[in-house]
Amino acid sequence: MGIRVLKGGMLTTVQDLGRTGYQSQGFGVAGVMDVRSFKIANLLLDNPENEAVLEFTLMGPTLQFTSETIIAVTGGDFLPHVNGKPVSMYTAIYMHKGDVLEFKGSRTGSRGYIAFSSYLDIPVVMGSRSTNLKCSLGGFKGRRLKDGDYIGFRIKRRYLPYFLSRTLDLDEFDQEEVTLRLVMGPQDRAFTKAGRETFLNEEYVVTSDFDRMG
């Protein structure tokens, strides 16, 4: 009763709202990068607000379901498909035993979220199920998901009232261009004026060496 990871994607981890209260001991908060999409995913399924989800970056995973459940996919539009057929985002999706969820690309955004009505069977570590990759802590064995991993569910599929109306208009969340804002810190004086101009105006390229920190 759970999900088998056929393909782990580029960076897929278990996340919730994070692990607070331990930063003074050297443990980062971790947690989801897009809190709004995370909360909407759980809201669509009547899940607890902080129920753990799968967060993926740039390339979604391929998952096979070993039992029935209901899921919701939010975040950027990664063109989700079930058994080769396209399915809607921001809506409750019924998954049968044996169904395969995969993603065909990235139309918008860089991160996506998959919530499960059966709850992922992930232990709570220091008050959270979030994965902290730097510390190899929490989540699924403290790491990103890999091909062949298996995650069980904690409960059987729950009945959801008004199932067909559990959907949101994706257009509300479409953004063709995103503005990144920053606040200069106390160390900015350590750089020359030309250096600051370079930082603010040059183009940046995301490589395969990126992680959740940058």
Say what each PLM segment does.
Residues 1-214:
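Conserved "landmark" site that anchors the functional core of diverse proteins
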